[in-house]
């Protein structure tokens, strides 16, 4: 069959041929392997989660069962099961799963940051006394001044007497309830 020179063909057929050539996207084997490894790591993270955390992630029943099985088995069987989970994730859209997992991690990091801030605030209350109480009352106007002063005073007495920090823990819990109410 003789092929016609390009100048003899109509412009629309040339445009269609160019579009078909543009649609072909070559993906290297290394990139495919990297993507597969990323999805396998996502599977490892899913297997390491607890039951309550897994309920918050949008998974279908097959994937949920595969993850539950991977959590029950050990060593080589678990490795193979994680590879299967990675393969199952390749057939699905992993983006919503990754977003839910990131949201869970972020919430955990926010809680840790809050705990550290409250511990610093408690230590500041024990060190500075009334000045720090005034700052806490500005930040948390719903706080009970008398209860806060009593907790600080008792925690300072315990610290001076080298007793276990029972009241300091109560002060921390009180600050935690204030931050939750805020």
Curated annotation (Swiss-Prot):
Superkingdom in the source lineage: Bacteria
Alphabetically ordered keywords of this record: Cytoplasm, Ribosome biogenesis, RNA-binding, rRNA-binding
Compartment list: Cytoplasm
Claim: Protein biosynthesis is one of the keywords in the record: no
Example of a GO MF term: rRNA binding
Region spans: Disordered: 1-20
Pfam families, sorted: DarP (PF04751)
Biological process per Gene Ontology, one example term: assembly of large subunit precursor of preribosome
Residues annotated as signal peptide: none
GO cellular component, one term: cytosol
Cross-referenced InterPro entries: DarP, DarP_sf
Disulfide bond positions: none
Coarse class of the protein's main subcellular location: cytoplasm
NCBIfam families according to UniProt: PRK05255.1-1 (NF003593)
Family of this protein: Belongs to the DarP family.
Role, per record: Member of a network of 50S ribosomal subunit biogenesis factors which assembles along the 30S-50S interface, preventing incorrect 23S rRNA structures from forming. Promotes peptidyl transferase center (PTC) maturation.
Identification of the protein by name: Dual-action ribosomal maturation protein DarP
Organism: Sodalis glossinidius (strain morsitans)
Gene of this entry: darP
